[in-house]
């Protein structure tokens, strides 16, 4: 079953998908959904996704048909209210173009770079390809909160003043600048709890079309990384940042050490900036 990963930036969505592909020893391709457009428009078309997977499989069609495709930033192709669907070539149009590929179809790829195929078109069956979609879905927690607390007036008219994705995202961005340090942890916990309650209708209200949502039966919410988690990321993995910087300094005969409170301060700054693990390197460099 295809999987939808949703959660804050820097929480490990891409790394998890890459690790799964390595453990299974299957081809893996990452597609940035923000570059996709409907067929006939400037930009990457839907077939380019499978072309990347085929390239990673060294043009072995059978191997590519068992691979994993990671659709990054899938929330950015949500339909935007006020734009006609026929003109939304980078949003709803892309979602519609992906439907057949997600459920399983034959995709013809015009060969360009492989000497093995001698210019012949390649046909790939997507039935057994695992598609993992990922996105931050900023504002989705507010849509869930509104659904859980909605009130009705008259014959079922919603009293909520917010309208879908645009208003929810705007409110979420405003919160990023108004959250006080003392309530940062409480705010993170509340958002995590709301993401745990996400339903298909919330994703549809966000801007994803029902047919697209239905092709991702498994929805996995990712939570904000805590201070302790960020400290572990700094120090424990094989390619952790702290050992990297210590090795770099040792080349100049400098011994670099970090006190525990310094590591916690770095983690706290990353939490305040809401950049997750991705922002740790920038904090250390600066």
Where are these regions (language model features)?
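AAA+ P-loop NTPase nucleotide-binding core of proteostasis motors
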Residues: 1-29, 33-42, 46-55, 59-286
